Amino acid sequence: MLHVALCRTGATLKLSFMIEPLLIAELALLGLTTGFLAGLLGVGGGMVMVPFVTLIMSSRGASSGLAVKMAIATSMATIMFTSISSVRAHHQRGAVRWDIAKRFAPGIVLGSFIGSLGVFALLKGTYLAIFFALFVGFSATQMIRDKKPAAARQLPGNAGLFGFGALIGFLSGLVGAGGAFISVPFMTWCNVHMRNAVATSAALGFPIAVANVIGYVITGRHVMDLPAGSFGYIWLPALGIIALCSVLTAPLGARATHALPVAVLKKVFASILYVLATYMLYRGLAG
C-alpha cells in the first residue's frame, strides 16, 4: 500500500510520496511505454505520461490543478532524455533532417519560453485546448486520408519555419508533449518523407524540452505546496524512474520505425493523435 505523508518545512506544507515498490513499478512501466513511443513516432509520450502522472499524484493527495501542472512539467523533463536516445538511433540511419531542425529551433525556443514562463502560470487554457483538439483532429484525419500533397509543395522559408516553430514550442509547453503532434503532420504535408519527419521531430523534442523545463523551474520555484522532491514544477522521483526506463526502449521504437511500412506508421500515429485530441477536447469542455 502506498502512503502519503505531510511534511512541514517552515510555513510550507509539502506532500511527501513514499517511493514504494508499486509506485516504482507504475512509473517504470510508464517510462518503458513512453520511451518506445518516443522512438517509434518521434513523440515524447506526453499524451500518455501526463494523464497517468496526474492520476498518480492526485490519488496521493495533490490537488487536481497542481497535479496537472506537475505532470506536464515532469513529462516535458523526461523528453530531454528520450529525445537524445531516440535521435541517436535515427541519426545512425541517416533519417534526421538536421537542415530542417536547425531552421525550426530558434522559433521553438522562443515559443517555449513564452508558454512556460508566462502562459503556463496564468492561462486555464479552456479555449486553447478546444482549438488545439480540433487542429490535432484535423491533422490526424489528413494523415488517415493519405491525400498526396501537391508535388510542388515545399517547406516554407526561414521566417515561416521560425513562426511555425514558435507555435510548436508554445503549444508543446502547455500540454507536456514533444511537438510531434504538429511537426510530423506539417512536415509530411510539405513532402518530407514520413520517416524523416518522425526522426526530425524527435530531434526537435530536445530544444522544446530544455526551454520549457527552464520555464517550469522558474515559475514553480515560489509555489508553496509542491511535493517533497520537487524542483520547480518537476517531480524528481518520477523524472528519474521514467527517464531511466524510457531510454531503454526508445532505440527499440526507433528501429521499429524503419521496419514498419509508412502507411501503417501513419495510421498508428493518427490513432494517437485522435486520443490526444479527445483528451484535450474533454479538458477544454470540462473547464
Predicted regions and their residues:
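Conserved, well-structured core segments that form the ligand-binding/active-site neighborhood
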Residues: 177
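Alpha-helical transmembrane segments of polytopic membrane transporters and translocases
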Residues: 73-77, 203-206
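Juxtamembrane transmembrane-helix boundary motif
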Residues: 3-41, 48, 52-69, 85-169, ...
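A structural-propensity feature for long, helix-poor, extended segments
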Residues: 79-83
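Hydrophobic alpha-helical transmembrane segments of multi-pass integral membrane proteins
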Residues: 199-217
